[in-house]
Swiss-Prot record:
Assigned EC number: 2.7.8.5
Taxonomic lineage of the native organism: Eukaryota, Metazoa, Chordata, Craniata, Vertebrata
Signal peptide: none
Entry-linked CDD domains: PLDc_PGS1_euk_1, PLDc_PGS1_euk_2
Subcellular location: Mitochondrion
Record-level GO BP terms: cardiolipin biosynthetic process; diacylglycerol metabolic process; phosphatidylglycerol biosynthetic process
Protein name: CDP-diacylglycerol--glycerol-3-phosphate 3-phosphatidyltransferase, mitochondrial
Name of the gene encoding the protein in the UniProt record: PGS1
GO cellular component: endoplasmic reticulum; mitochondrial inner membrane; mitochondrion
Enzyme class: transferase
Residues recorded as bearing Phosphoserine in the entry: S49
The organelle targeting sequence, given as a residue range: 1-28
Active site: H220, K222, D227
Binding site for ATP: A124, S125, L126, Y127, L128, G129, T130, G131
Keyword ATP-binding (UniProt): yes
Length: 556
């Protein structure tokens, strides 16, 4: 008992000490990192071993596939059925899935969907920018809300927006001030929730400067939902994401069950967030523990229950729904079945929502991603992309220790979102170069250059923010699975932030071709990384950046 108490007290001690260090970001980062390590027994057990080829054996076992009578997919349709043991499984026709390719297409689709929304608009993002394009989006919302009130038969249109508190409150003009007019004009229809991480509290919250407080933890989910249609993306609601910041986007059209799930998920996170008021103050939901003034353990426990209730109830609901569907279908005549098929095509594509909220002890995305990497067999190809190359130790070990081929796409320094930034932030691209070089050196030292290849995205006048993966089974020229959403595969995504993405599994060749073309378009703008890459003058990393990077890499 005493040992457990001492272990639990360790992180508290370091964080209290951290709070006494104003103006010393380097030392503060060091102590914060020590605090994290003291509290992460699981991660310590995963530290790199020289026996890298044993990585598949050391990784989590694939969850056992069960075959309840209510399962959506008959055995053998696809090998990823085990995911349904963790999350709800949504079967859809591939004709309802469209892959978008550009920021402009993303922006125009959002505006168009807002204009025709009748029942609900739900938007979750890190922040809303303050420029003219963002104002155009707000104006679309205002116009649609106005029409809903003036219609002959007024609709019950509701708008729910979830943003991060720290990022959305930065500066005098910010996400909050952009949304206040909507909130004041339509108080019964508009809800704005601002998530505040429970780990930013006390002296730490008072002393960390505005821009740096975001490193402690964020609301990072990106979901844009209009009635029964959903866009899943990694893009934020900001002008660059509408013009020249490359990301990924998938549009799920008329998928009511998926839209219901993400509405409930955003509502759940919204309920444990601070509620923006018309006077620009914030309030906690009645009966909810305050995220940074209340007891942290109690708050996290309540948040875990709220989110897991959504996941588990949706999973049960889907099982029951599909059990009824299959039972009904078995009683239909051939003509009835054909007629039913005209109304709702048989599913050839399966959607799995993967949620990662480590502050609330929810690690579904981490489990699924590690299992996918573990199970990728010899001859399979994994195309993995991230705008910020900073893989967790577990992901790195799996890439280096398993048998599939990997092509990893990352941002060249010039298209990194921090390139040219003022102050300390301007050194972040160099820190990523340092991390990239260390990983490349390890690949070479293990003789894995043929199996694991790094590629850098470059496009004049653009930045790069795409993340996710495409999985090609051995012998296949098209992907059967993709992960798309907000996670970056880095420490922050796994441990600090709230994340959501979806796994799309499809046997439809046309949709597989869409995903393949998406992958090809991104990789075509890249160059292969070699030893010569790091000899270029632009890749020289200053000594102080090399020294600081290990101390701060868990914060970005």
């Amino acid at each position: 008992m005493a040992v457990a108490a001492a272990a639990a007290a360790g992180p508290v001690f370091w964080r209290r000490l951290l709070g006494l260090l104003p103006g010393r970001p380097g030392l503060a980062a060091l102590l914060g990192r020590l605090s994290d390590r003291l509290g992460r027994n699981r991660d310590r057990q995963r530290r790199r071993s020289p026996w890298l080829l044993l990585a598949p054996l050391l990784s989590p076992a694939v969850p056992q596939v069960t075959s309840p009578p209510c399962c959506l997919c008959p055995e053998g349709v696809h090998r990823f059925q085990w995911i349904r043991n963790l999350v709800p499984e949504f079967g859809v026709s591939s004709s309802h899935v469209r892959v978008l390719s550009s920021p402009a297409e993303f922006f125009e689709l959002m505006k168009g969907q807002i204009r025709v929304a009748k029942r609900r608009v739900v938007m979750a993002s890190l922040y809303l920018g303050t420029g003219p394009l963002e104002q155009e989006l707000v104006d679309c919302l205002e116009s649609t809300l106005e029409k809903s009130l003036q219609a002959k038969f007024p609709s019950n249109l509701k708008v729910s927006i979830l943003l991060d508190f720290t990022r959305g409150s930065r500066g005098r003009k910010n996400s909050r001030t952009m949304l206040l007019p909507l909130l004041r004009r339509f108080p019964e229809q508009v809800r704005v929730s601002l998530f505040h991480t429970p780990h930013l509290r006390g002296l730490l919250r008072l002393l960390i400067p505005e821009r740096f407080n975001e490193t402690i933890g964020l609301q990072h989910i990106k979901v844009y939902l209009f009635d029964n249609s959903v866009i899943l993306s990694g893009a934020n609601l900001s002008d660059s994401y509408f013009t020249n910041r490359q990301d990924r986007y998938v549009f799920l059209q008329d998928c009511a069950e998926i839209a219901d799930f993400f509405t409930e998920l955003v509502d759940a996170v919204g309920d444990v967030s601070l509620q923006l008021q018309g006077d620009d103050t914030v309030q906690v939901v009645d009966g909810m523990v305050h995220p940074y003034k209340g007891d942290r353990a109690e708050y996290c426990k309540a948040a875990n229950k709220r989110v897991m209730d959504v996941i588990n109830s949706a999973r049960t609901r889907q099982q029951m729904l599909h059990a009824q569907t299959f039972h009904s279908n078995s009683l239909l005549t051939q003509e009835d079945a054909a007629a039913a098929g005209d109304r709702r095509p048989a599913p050839d594509t399966w959607i799995y929502p993967l949620i990662q909220m480590k502050p609330f002890e929810i690690q579904i995305d981490e489990i699924v991603t590690e299992t996918l990497l573990t199970e990728a067999e010899r001859g399979a190809k994994v195309y993995l992309t991230t705008g910020y190359f900073n893989l967790t130790q577990a992901y790195m070990d799996l890439v280096l220790g398993t048998r599939a081929e990997y092509q990893i796409l990352l941002a060249s320094p010039e298209v990194n979102g921090f390139f040219g930034a003022k102050g300390v932030a301007g050194a972040i691209p160099a820190a990523y170069v340092h991390i990239e070089r260390q990983f490349f050196s390890e690949v070479c030292s293990l003789g894995q250059q043929e199996r694991v290849q790094l590629q850098e995205y470059w496009r004049r006048g653009w930045t790069f923010h795409a993340k996710g993966l495409w999985l090609y089974l051995a012998g296949s020229s098209l992907p059967c699975l993709t992960l798309i959403g907000s996670p970056n595969f880095g420490y922050r995504s796994v441990h600090r932030d709230l994340e959501a993405q979806i796994a799309i599994v499809t046997e439809n060749q046309a949709l597989q071709q869409q995903l393949h073309q998406e992958q090809e378009q991104l990789y075509l703008r890249s160059g292969v990384v070699s030893s010569a890459t790091f000899e270029q003058p632009s890749r020289q990393v200053k000594l102080w950046v090399k020294m600081v990077t290990p101390l701060i890499k868990n914060f970005f």
